[in-house]
Amino acid sequence: MIGAFKRQLLSNLAFIFLFSFLFAVYCQSAIFFFDNAEAVRENTAASSDFTERLILLDAGHGGEDGGTVGVNGINEKVLNLETSAALEVYLRFAGFEVVQTRTEDVLLYDKSTDFKGRKKMLDLAERLRIAEELLPDLFISIHMNSFPDGKYAGLTVYYSPNDERSRVAAELMRASVVEHLQPDNRRELKRAGSNIYLLDRLDTPSVLVECGFLSNAEECELLCTKEYRHKLSFVLFSSVSSFFEE
């Protein structure tokens, strides 16, 4: 009887602890968002045209394609999607129209076609089709980086060579990150080559953001926290709003 009571008590305590933890995480995220709400308004006060601006967010990988794997075992695809979702919150709050290429853990290929050995290519082709159909004012692809040597860290921005405004957007993103989040970041902007499928083919302003190195233990740990992803997303949002005020 006593053993059953203790098991029930421990079960109840575990539930209370879990609920308290999840509530604390929610409150922390909410506090960060509302603490920055005034900053969002200040960022958008200079322009009344944001409601006419379409941002296409592209969370890289998904489904069967997990992307790179962090030192702690996290799949890149998860962090890409969560970072894109956080960025969307700030953009929408400021009045931007936002579309995501994916909002679920999926690869974007037609499962009714002959996809064997072609899933990744079909996925990229579908993302390209979406972007060419929507013609966004800015295309932002979200990814995470990795390298065999775990000493490397820091956000990196690639820009499309097909529209000069892509480099402008990338420069603003890098500058904002250095000023507000990573003051020691010395990573240079990178012009996308043919190996970056989407940026090589898109004619609209397009950037790809490698948010950090999952091969670096410290940075991987940061990127796995909701608080840091929201800070990063806010910094990226700030640069996007500056881009449309240029």
Predicted regions and their residues:
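Catalytic-site microenvironment of enzymes
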Residues: 1-246
